[in-house]
Design a protein with these regions (language model features):
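Penicillin-recognizing serine hydrolase domain
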Residues: 96-171
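A short, well-structured edge-of-sheet supersecondary motif
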Residues: 1-10
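Active-site helix/loop module of the DD-peptidase/beta-lactamase fold
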Residues: 47-64, 104-117
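Solvent-exposed, polar/charged alpha-helical surfaces in well-ordered, non-transmembrane soluble domains
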Residues: 6, 29, 33, 71-75, ...
Length: 171
């Protein structure tokens, strides 16, 4: 139950598995916490790096040097599972994806997520450490609950069924 935190049913809830794009729940949580703490604003402009533009997988095909608002980046992460935007936001907030991943793991510990270890901000499994990128259903519930209870404004992005960015231009 999201309000009380009571588990209503569980089966292998602590089995650590690769979370793939569910990783972006934590990425969005840290972005929303940065917005709420006024470290960044939804209207701030983020510039995509070469690293972000080269992420692959689900993406909106950012070009290196392309700029977009935090709001549009969040929309792209929530709606399109955009790895390029997740990486650009990580770099914008923490200076590097690696530093952002350290913050993700720290936040996971603070939330009591005992079955979780992140190695990137996207969930992509294309690097050497991908086997170490794990979480459990229980831990996903913990971070999702935190996001739902403390960052209800994110719903404006997660409830979109169709929208455009870049004036409807793709890539």
């Amino acid at each position: 139950d999201v309000t009380t935190g009571t588990v209503l049913y569980e089966n292998n809830s602590h089995e650590a598995l690769a979370p793939a794009s569910v990783t972006k729940v934590m990425t969005m949580l840290l972005i929303m916490e940065a917005v709420d703490s006024e470290k960044i604003a939804l209207t701030d402009t983020v510039t995509a790096s070469e690293n972000a533009a080269a992420k692959g997988g689900s993406q909106i095909y950012l070009k290196a040097g392309e700029t977009m608002t935090v709001s549009d980046m969040l929309k792209s992460i929530a709606v399109s599972s955009a790895n390029d935007c997740a990486c650009a936001m990580a770099e914008h907030i923490a200076g590097s994806e690696s530093a952002f991943v350290d913050a993700m793991n720290q936040r996971a510990r603070e939330l009591g997520m005992q079955d979780t270890h992140f190695v990137n901000c996207t969930g992509l499994d294309d690097d050497a450490n991908a086997r170490e990128h794990l979480t459990s259903a229980y831990d996903i519930a913990l971070m999702s609950r935190e996001l739902i209870l403390h960052h209800p404004d994110l719903r404006r992005f997660t409830t979109i069924w169709m929208d455009t960015i870049r004036g409807g231009e793709f890539g």
